[in-house]
Amino acid sequence: MRADDNPSARSLHAQFPGDDTRPTSKKELAGWYSYGWAAEVFTVCAMGSFLPITLEQMARDRGVLLSDKVTPCSASWNGTETTARTHGISPPWYGINATPGTSQCVVYILGAEINTASFAMYTFSVSVFVQAVLIISMSGAADHGSFRKTLLVAFAVIGSVCTMLFLSVVPKIYIVGALFAIVANTCFGASFVLLNSFLPLLVRHHPSLLGHENERSPELNHSHITDDRVQFAANADYGIDADATSPLLQPVQGDSDEHTTSRLPVTSVVISEELKLSTRISSLGIGIGYIGAVILQIICILVIIATRQTTFSLRLVLFLIGLWWFVFTIPAALWLRPRPGPPLPKAPQGKDNRSCVGYMVYAWKSLCRTAVRTRHLKDILLFLTAWFLLSDGIATVSGTAVLFAKTQLNMKPAALGLINVVTMMAGVFGAFSWSFVSRRLNLGASQTIIACILLFELIPIYGLLGFVPAIRKLGYLGLQQPWEMFPLGIVYGLVMGGLSSYCRSFFGELIPPGNEAAFYALYAITDKGSSIFGPAIVGLITDRYGEIRPAFVFLAVLIFLPLPLMLLVDVGRGKKDALALAVELEEGQSSNTQTYGTLSNCERNAVPTDQ
């Protein structure tokens, strides 16, 4: 009989009052997988395809042409089709090219003239900002007490309902659509942080590992597993730590509380088993989520074609995405156990800080403490700066490309959705192929990242070729025809497949041993926070020049800037500095008194998107 089929498997000792030490059940695992299947569709199908063009289209339906600022706008693909048919041309299903700038539209919000494409970019920037603030602020409440599952379900319901409500949003109230988009994206990010926080608990309490309990140190059941090999390798896919209580905010060396004891070594048997199990569960979760996203993406494309690719078609597929998210959240709500965390530590004055304000202060102080420690680590600062710029470029290129294809190339929604399918398939291929290429060419992690950046740089440079007079005369190349978006989507997918794994791996080599959770938190916040700026700047450029193509200059610079920073990172020096800091923190541990908070571990918001 397999271990996970054994209902009599022993549970671990409780580490705090109310600790749920029951073995992980198959139903609980199914609930965890179910939410990945439910929510991944939002980042892939909504944020990656249909939400940006829906916002742009609803604003367009209320806007006027940029050329005369009087003529009302209409759907770019419908308007172009009418022109094509007038000249006896049968337009293809994917759209037809138009003269750049002829279909650019503007709307007036609070007296300001805003390009309809910029409106979608500004909405994305605001949603990312709100998401980052919420994720940090709610971390304390998610870690301590029994709020983890409650918050996950609440965010899932709110986010999915807001997505479904797009069906009722008509162009006349397009601003309401932007508000729904902000709330939905914020709730998605927060819910996935909470989902990822369950994985270490599911692994730790899995029946197949409880048989190795005797091989642990006797005190291990009352300590956090912090071996750096486990912290990174076991959870590289989801970017989370493998500690016992799985907090979003957790103690590290130099901090202590009444629920944390000294760090103890873990036997190689336990490390190996937890590593294998965590990798298996997380990989399966990612695969299930992407399979669901591809299935729904194809369904959405068929629905859009069947409903003649109108604004209503876009609202309808967003309703379907929200409905999918809501329905498949139900098994997660029923089958996942709350798995509460330890009580919130008391403040230095001995006061109980379990109010909402107390939880938020706890979280922000923890994050700040981690940020302060990075000043001792030059190479981590260099890498995080590079990652800030690179992740901003990743998010901005995705949104910019979709809106460029719609407003400049007049591509139809079905074709835009198909680009996303092609990109996802290329991303899966890239995740495996980069590993093969790096081994074949004997490339290190940093060299592979640099290769990805150079390949990534080709995307905006290719778009800038459209400014070259000789190429413009050709009528193709330089992103002048819709079909050119598909090979660029393949390039983007290949790049994402490499960067998503190698950047995290490279960063892991620079972290002080025993501080993985805290520094991966900073890594994730850097990732999320950076996406505030790129889309907003692209929006400003689009408003200034009346079209998106000039923004490729900004994107080319944004993608290039991480390159010299990555070349300055010295792994050997970084490891040496990290070890020195770890020793310093270890030596100071015995002299530390009770602190208010612990270091933030918001790294659990690393998803796949996209986004």
From Swiss-Prot:
Superkingdom to which the source organism belongs: Eukaryota
A Pfam family cross-referenced in the UniProt record is ATG22
- Keywords, comma-separated and alphabetical: Amino-acid transport, Autophagy, Glycoprotein, Membrane, Transmembrane, Transmembrane helix, Transport, Vacuole
Biological process according to GO = amino acid transmembrane export from vacuole; autophagy
> Which GO cellular component does the record give, naming just one?
vacuolar membrane
Give the subcellular location.
Vacuole membrane
Report the main location listed first in the record: membrane
Q: Region Disordered: what ranges?
A: 1-24
Could you tell me what this protein is called? Autophagy-related protein 22-2
Protein's organism = Aspergillus clavatus (strain ATCC 1007 / CBS 513.65 / DSM 816 / NCTC 3887 / NRRL 1 / QM 1276 / 107)
